[in-house]
């Protein structure tokens, strides 16, 4: 069984790389389902009010994906359950979200992860982090065109996105739940450039070989 999860900020290319990897490896792809998330547009309008509700909704969604991934044995997911708390913690540190709500969420996350079936299967076999600069992040957010994410809708989102990036590097450095690797999303445009795509896929294949999950 090989379970791969993608991580990275908004606009990093997680869903695109998930599709490419799932096709390459012949595995099931699982997506965050942003377009079907009824809370996300509300969150962007009022983060203080909706942070707890959004993260609880996402936690339930991720655990359902984990259960399905275990049943399917091989899968690639475009968002890691381990990084959801990063968004919540950032909002607490910024004074947007309530610290008590974060403690409740963190306890809920821990308890629900304990109930996930199959002790080894709680953790992925590989986490792939896509690193991007703020310029690349903003360009891709603008390109995909979700209205509630756009700076033209809310210019203050630029500061929010910049803060989010500043939280990701320390989070990735501390992450130790599974083997991990970093992809440079600025250097390798794996969506538009075939050569970059091939290099990224080859690097992931080699990592899977190194950790014993690909022959």
UniProtKB/Swiss-Prot annotation:
<feature type="binding site">
    <location>
        <position position="79"/>
    </location>
    <ligand>
        <name>substrate</name>
    </ligand>
</feature>
<dbReference type="InterPro" id="IPR002624">
    <property type="entry name" value="DCK/DGK"/>
</dbReference>
<keyword id="KW-0808">Transferase</keyword>
<dbReference type="InterPro" id="IPR031314">
    <property type="entry name" value="DNK_dom"/>
</dbReference>
<keyword id="KW-0067">ATP-binding</keyword>
<dbReference type="InterPro" id="IPR027417">
    <property type="entry name" value="P-loop_NTPase"/>
</dbReference>
<feature type="binding site">
    <location>
        <position position="149"/>
    </location>
    <ligand>
        <name>substrate</name>
    </ligand>
</feature>
<dbReference type="Pfam" id="PF01712">
    <property type="entry name" value="dNK"/>
</dbReference>
<keyword id="KW-0418">Kinase</keyword>
<feature type="binding site">
    <location>
        <begin position="8"/>
        <end position="16"/>
    </location>
    <ligand>
        <name>ATP</name>
    </ligand>
</feature>
<comment type="function">
    <text>DGK/DAK plays an essential role in generating the deoxyribonucleotide precursors, dGTP and dATP, for DNA metabolism.</text>
</comment>
<feature type="binding site">
    <location>
        <position position="55"/>
    </location>
    <ligand>
        <name>substrate</name>
    </ligand>
</feature>
<dbReference type="InterPro" id="IPR050566">
    <property type="entry name" value="Deoxyribonucleoside_kinase"/>
</dbReference>
<dbReference type="GO" id="GO:0004136">
    <property type="term" value="F:deoxyadenosine kinase activity"/>
</dbReference>
<feature type="binding site">
    <location>
        <position position="84"/>
    </location>
    <ligand>
        <name>substrate</name>
    </ligand>
</feature>
<dbReference type="GO" id="GO:0005524">
    <property type="term" value="F:ATP binding"/>
</dbReference>
<keyword id="KW-0547">Nucleotide-binding</keyword>
<protein>
    <recommendedName>
        <fullName>Deoxyadenosine kinase</fullName>
        <ecNumber>2.7.1.76</ecNumber>
    </recommendedName>
</protein>
<feature type="active site" description="Proton acceptor">
    <location>
        <position position="78"/>
    </location>
</feature>
<dbReference type="GO" id="GO:0005737">
    <property type="term" value="C:cytoplasm"/>
</dbReference>
<comment type="similarity">
    <text>Belongs to the DCK/DGK family.</text>
</comment>
<feature type="binding site">
    <location>
        <position position="44"/>
    </location>
    <ligand>
        <name>substrate</name>
    </ligand>
</feature>
<comment type="subunit">
    <text>Heterodimer of a deoxyadenosine (DAK) and a deoxyguanosine kinase (DGK).</text>
</comment>
<feature type="binding site">
    <location>
        <position position="32"/>
    </location>
    <ligand>
        <name>substrate</name>
    </ligand>
</feature>
């Amino acid at each position: 069984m090989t379970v791969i999860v993608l991580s990275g900020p908004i606009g990093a290319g997680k869903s695109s790389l998930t599709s490419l990897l799932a096709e390459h490896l012949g595995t099931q792809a699982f997506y965050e389902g942003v377009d079907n998330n009824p809370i996300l547009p509300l969150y962007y309008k009022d983060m203080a009010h909706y942070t707890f509700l959004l993260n609880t909704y996402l936690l339930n969604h991720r655990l359902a994906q984990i259960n399905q991934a275990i049943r399917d044995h091989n899968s690639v997911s475009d968002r890691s359950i381990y990084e959801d708390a990063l968004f919540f913690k950032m909002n607490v540190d910024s004074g947007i979200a309530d610290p008590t709500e974060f403690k409740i969420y963190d306890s809920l996350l821990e308890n629900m992860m304990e109930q996930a079936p199959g002790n080894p299967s709680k953790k992925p076999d590989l986490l792939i982090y896509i690193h991007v600069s703020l310029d690349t992040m903003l360009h891709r957010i603008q390109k995909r065109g979700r209205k509630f994410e756009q700076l033209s809708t809310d210019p203050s989102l630029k500061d929010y996105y910049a803060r989010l990036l500043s939280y990701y590097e320390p989070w990735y450095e501390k992450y130790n739940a599974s083997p991990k690797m970093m992809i440079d999303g600025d250097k390798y445009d794996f969506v538009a450039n075939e050569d970059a795509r091939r290099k990224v896929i080859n690097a992931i294949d080699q990592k899977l070989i190194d950790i014993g999950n690909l022959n």
